[in-house]
A protein has these predicted regions:
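Conserved mixed alpha/beta catalytic, RNA-binding, or beta-rich assembly cores of soluble enzyme
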Residues: 1-11, 20-361
Length: 361
């Protein structure tokens, strides 16, 4: 692609590789039965609670299927009106119409249906209460509550199925009397009968592969990015930065869904991508620090301000509006938006000139 496009590579250009390519090249797959066996070994007999799962067939249906097979009885506690990343179980407008303006009450499945009537996801049309109950079969009941400790009224053994708040909820449940709590990163964090696994993230970041199989988040990614950087340097003579990326960290302004269903945007990256930008706001500088200068004089004045800027602009007026986010979160989101989630066929993204600024010649 570089040769055909006559692209001139430079130091600090970035090669981003989607996690799916890495995971598939590793053969990092597992089955629903692998999950069931691991859950049974870790949770034992009796009733198990599952709190705050994401509302997604791609992300959670096979995980739930495996959990259900590994448990005698299951109680699923859903948050409402949204899951953790903003997927709506039911329209918030519908709840407002029913007079529900705060969400601190606990409902049984029957009570919730009586309150809202038909449940329908605004985009897919699915009723996720029905979807998840059908996946689990007869040994399942569903409650709705936004308090993670509600589940302890039903069982003291809990799987915290949330993604980004899992550690906080696990700690809270244990402090409030839970006997056993695991999170999704503790399921398949080792191989079961030769299955794939991820020692750091377990089944977090996994995707549905077939009705009985999941593709797991890739492992050994730190080694992969270092080897890729070394090989690219040998071939091109340029020291590029490399990263593996999954979901971007952006929020859909129409649907209100935060797209980050993976545990992290980037599980591994080379050292040059560590840190956050340290930038000044050009609009602020232009309005406040260059006076009546115009044209070339204004341009040179702004470049001088950039070149002399402090190494830490935190809480300084010149940095207003430049919220510092990690390079890997920004770049991974850029790569994910570029590659898309469907049939673009762009599993590798080249990003050039990202670290340039206005003062660079």
């Amino acid at each position: 692609a570089v040769k055909e496009g006559k692209i001139k590579l430079k130091d600090r250009d970035i090669v981003a590789v989607t996690e799916a390519v890495v995971a598939k090249s590793q053969g990092n797959f597992a089955t629903v039965d692998d999950i069931a066996k691991d859950v049974r070994e870790k949770m034992g007999e009796g009733t198990v609670g599952v709190i705050f799962p994401i509302l997604s067939r791609n992300r959670f249906s096979n995980i739930l299927k495996g959990i259900a097979r590994g448990c005698d009885n299951l109680i699923i506690q859903l948050s409402y009106p949204f899951d953790e990343v903003g997927n709506p179980l039911v329209s918030i407008d519908k709840l407002y119409e029913k007079g529900v303006t705060n969400f601190n009450k606990t409902y049984t499945e029957k009570q919730f249906y009586k309150l809202v009537g038909k449940i329908e996801h605004p985009f897919t049309g699915l009723d996720y209460i029905d979807v998840y109950k059908k996946i689990c079969g007869e040994n399942c009941r569903i409650i709705l509550s936004n308090d993670p400790t509600t589940i302890l009224k039903y069982t003291k053994k809990v799987i915290s199925a949330d993604i980004h708040s899992r550690h906080r909820n696990k700690d809270l449940l244990l402090k409030r009397g839970a006997k056993k709590v695991i999170t999704l990163d503790e399921i398949l964090n080792h191989s079961i009968n030769g299955s794939g696994y991820n020692e750091e993230f377990g089944v977090l970041g996994s995707n549905l592969s077939t009705d009985e199989k999941l593709k797991l988040f890739p492992r050994d990614t730190k080694t992969f990015v270092k080897q890729l950087q070394k090989r690219l340097c040998e071939v091109s003579g340029v020291k590029m930065e490399c990263m593996v990326y999954g979901d971007g960290a952006f929020k859909d302004p129409v649907g209100g869904i935060w797209e980050l269903a993976d545990p992290v945007v980037s599980p591994a990256y080379t050292s040059g991508l560590t840190g956050t930008p340290n930038e000044i706001k050009l609009k602020y500088v232009a309005d406040n620090q260059i006076g009546d200068l115009k044209g070339k004089a204004a341009e040179e004045a702004i470049k001088e301000i950039i070149n002399k800027k402090s190494k830490n602009l935190k809480n300084q007026n010149v940095s207003l509006g430049t919220t510092p986010r990690r390079y890997t979160d920004l770049l991974g989101s850029l790569a994910d938006l570029t590659s898309g989630s469907g049939d673009k066929g762009t599993p590798i993204v080249l990003i050039t000139g990202y670290f340039n600024n206005y003062a660079d010649e």
